[in-house]
Amino acid sequence: MIEIYSRPGCPFCNKLITVVEYEGLPHIVYVLDRDYTREDFYEKFGEGSTFPQLILDGIHLGGCQESIKYMQEEKICCQI
């Protein structure tokens, strides 16, 4: 299961969500100020973390580019 921590209006969040949905991967999207606070986000991922952040089966992959790269390398998605 993929967990995406996003915020409204974030283009990288939208890109990552679009990729995951296009690939048909099971996921849940958590939205800042609806599902969690900024303090919760920094406590979970660290003060310097940016949006989005992705967790795959309990493993923190990181932001948009890191997550897509990992999923490509592991042949989970995005095979072009």
Walk through the language-model features, giving the residues of each:
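Structural micro-motif
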Residues: 45-55, 64-65
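Short alpha-helical
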Residues: 11, 36, 62
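Conserved beta-strand scaffold positions in the cores of enzyme catalytic domains, especially
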Residues: 27-29, 60
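Thioredoxin-like thiol-disulfide oxidoreductase module
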Residues: 31-48
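Local sequence-structure signature of Cys/Sec-based thiol-disulfide redox active-site neighborhoods
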Residues: 1-27
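Alpha-helical elements of the RecA-like P-loop NTPase motor core of helicases
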Residues: 14, 18, 39, 69
